[in-house]
């Protein structure tokens, strides 16, 4: 019993000490880069619209979009709507809507909201867009899409065959956009966006069965047999994470409050990862996938880490902080960091970087500790069991990162001026896996389905994925399926290539310290 309590409280103490060290390193690391210090923290508030207008730094912007941005307009189905007063009340986050000002949101609005028709029922447009405005925006979208395809070819290191490359000569933007709107409407008609109570109850029963088997194995197996109980504990966390992910997308129940409660249970209580924190950051991950801004750095919070650089375009945001010297060894450190400190890192991060205080987060943390005390007290080897479980959870981290880490990065302003579907397709890949193992990926092996249609219930991903592949092939876009092991190898190779550039082109003395 004492060992269990020591383990749990050591983790909490380690959390506080670790955070103190990180804060100290950042505080005493000298004058940081202007660009790096401008990168918003996870608790920072979004800029006012007036500041956001000035922050746009794109080499080529659309004049129509810039005028509409200044007026606080968005384009939906050919009509301009004024959202300037609504921006700061946007449930999905202030910055999410700010970054789409002036853009055509016809597709992204539909797929990001479960009830788009109801939302727009009583909203009146300011005016219809003129043919000249529509043509200018379409022309800019086409330009951005072709630039993204070119960047994909130039900067991808994991392309195994020419079939994986975009074919710009096959791409026609208007036909592409019509096909994807039609596909969305087909999925709606088929009921693929409706949550299933039966599916939820079944998966929750499986989850409870896993942790029950872990406890039973602790009682039945010899005291020295800690691998199976630990693996089952890790699998419990692993699958809890996927259900938290579904809940925080509001894909498990028809009621948003109930989804938030389920996210709290599966995430904060079962997994130990703050569900509300995940929801806030994950919304931005979908809206800002693999993007950055020349002035403020990373825009996709879930693809940012201070200890490694995934893409050469991100090098200017690294170099002068002490912790950045680790990027010189990122190809070596990546897997050890994921496996050794991955679980503790995300538990700490989700608790201490929550954007606003929520009492139920503290309650969830207490429930998590009590639950795991009850579980780990059933074995005489709680520490090895916990360690094995943490190692298993590292697989979850690799699964979540592998879908995007080797894919291209774009300036956010350019990305939002382009086509949402093209952007998501070029920044994503699927995992190729046998049918029997799909459950281990939480459905996210079908990642194109998830990123193109975030509110789609994952029980239908196996149906929607072939339809998406067909449209990608028709329009000359890559649809990449890669084995999990090959993906991990690709990430390590990518880190090795990027760190070479960082060593020669990085900013600040840290970049050259170990070259």
UniProtKB/Swiss-Prot annotation:
Motif (Histidine box-3): 447-451
Cofactor(s) listed in the protein's UniProt record: Fe(2+)
Gene Ontology terms: cellular component: membrane
Key word Cell membrane present: no
Top-level lineage group: Eukaryota
Entry's family note: Belongs to the fatty acid desaturase type 1 family.
Subcellular location(s) per record: Membrane
Catalytic activity field: a (4E,8E)-4-sphinga-4,8-dienine ceramide + 2 Fe(II)-[cytochrome b5] + O2 + 2 H(+) = an N-acyl-(4E,8E,10E)-sphingatrienine + 2 Fe(III)-[cytochrome b5] + 2 H2O
Functional note: Fatty acid desaturase that catalyzes the introduction of the third double bond at the Delta(10) position in d18:3Delta4,8,10 triunsaturated sphingolipid long fatty acid chains. The cytochrome b5 domain probably acts as the direct electron donor to the active site of the desaturase.
PANTHER family: DELTA(5) FATTY ACID DESATURASE FAT-4 (PTHR19353:SF88), FATTY ACID DESATURASE 2 (PTHR19353)
Keywords: Electron transport, Heme, Iron, Lipid metabolism, Membrane, Metal-binding, Oxidoreductase, Sphingolipid metabolism, Transmembrane, Transmembrane helix, Transport
UniProt pathway annotation: Lipid metabolism; sphingolipid metabolism
Single annotated GO MF: oxidoreductase activity, acting on paired donors, with oxidation of a pair of donors resulting in the reduction of molecular oxygen to two molecules of water
Protein name in UniProt: Sphingolipid 10-desaturase
Motif (Histidine box-2): 281-286
GO biological process: lipid metabolic process; sphingolipid biosynthetic process
Annotated source species: Thalassiosira pseudonana (Marine diatom)
Stored InterPro entries: Cyt_B5-like_heme/steroid-bd (IPR001199), Cyt_B5-like_heme/steroid_sf (IPR036400), Cyt_B5_heme-BS (IPR018506), FA_desaturase_dom (IPR005804), Fatty_acid_desaturase (IPR012171)
SUPFAM superfamilies, per database record: Cytochrome b5-like heme/steroid binding domain
EC number: 1.14.19.19
Membrane-topology descriptor: Multi-pass membrane protein
Binding positions for heme per the UniProt entry: 90, 113
Pfam short name (any one): Cyt-b5
Domain Cytochrome b5 heme-binding residues, every copy: 46-113
Primary enzyme class: oxidoreductase
Comment block on domains: The histidine box domains may contain the active site and/or be involved in metal ion binding.
Transmembrane residue ranges: 3-23, 198-218, 258-278, 322-342, 359-379, 382-402
